[in-house]
């Protein structure tokens, strides 16, 4: 009798362990008749835009001069982005450059549309994208993000101030974007 109980316990344990794998293979209605399943051919290659140097080719000094914020520290610097913070701390103004390779700008724009006061089309030096403005009740328009599309890639400059007075964030974001476009190869 003990042997039968043990075998039954092992069989039930095996079925319980196997259930998630089998359930993952089941037809749960996701592939309904007539539905299309997107696929990408194995040999499809994305079309990349130009190469952007580190930090979009913009120096720490240029960011400091344009933003008029002293004591900026480049706290994150790698091949796809940079971030400048006042005194290196997370409180206060922040400025960043990001380069998204093979990433759809539409998804980023949609996120901006859900979280910013306004999002508009923009064209800088013949390149299309968006400009997003964020505001705070006590500061007014204190954040500006410019995203520009290059084939399957895009870049984004973000300029955010935390206390008055400050220069117009969108003027800075547009100028930084212009400089990055000029520095691209």
From Swiss-Prot:
The membrane topology of this protein is: Lipid-anchor
According to the record, the residues making up region (Disordered) are 26-50
Main location per UniProt?
membrane
User: What keyword terms does UniProt attach to this protein?
Assistant: Cell membrane, Lipoprotein, Membrane, Palmitate, Signal
Subcellular localization is given as: Cell membrane
Q: Where is the lipid attached (N-palmitoyl cysteine)?
A: 25
The region annotated as signal peptide is 1-24
Q: At which residues does the record annotate a lipid attachment of kind S-diacylglycerol cysteine?
A: 25
A GO CC annotation recorded here is: plasma membrane
- Protein's name according to its UniProt entry: Putative lipoprotein LprB
């Amino acid at each position: 009798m003990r042997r039968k109980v043990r075998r039954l316990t092992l069989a039930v344990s095996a079925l319980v362990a196997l259930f998630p794998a089998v359930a993952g293979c089941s037809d749960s209605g996701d592939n309904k008749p007539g539905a299309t399943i997107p696929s990408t051919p194995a040999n499809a290659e994305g079309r990349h835009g130009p190469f952007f140097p580190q930090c979009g080719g913009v120096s720490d000094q240029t960011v400091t001069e344009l933003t008029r914020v002293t004591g900026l520290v480049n706290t994150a610097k790698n091949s796809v982005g940079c971030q400048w913070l006042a005194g290196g701390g997370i409180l206060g103004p922040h400025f960043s450059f990001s380069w998204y390779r093979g990433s759809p700008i539409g998804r980023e724009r949609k996120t901006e549309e859900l979280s910013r006061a306004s999002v508009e089309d923009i064209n800088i030096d013949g390149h299309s994208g968006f400009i997003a403005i964020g505001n705070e009740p006590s500061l007014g328009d204190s954040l500006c993000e410019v995203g520009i599309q290059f084939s399957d890639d895009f870049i984004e400059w973000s300029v955010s101030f935390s206390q008055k007075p400050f220069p117009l964030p969108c003027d800075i974001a547009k100028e930084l974007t212009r400089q990055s476009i000029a520095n691209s190869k």
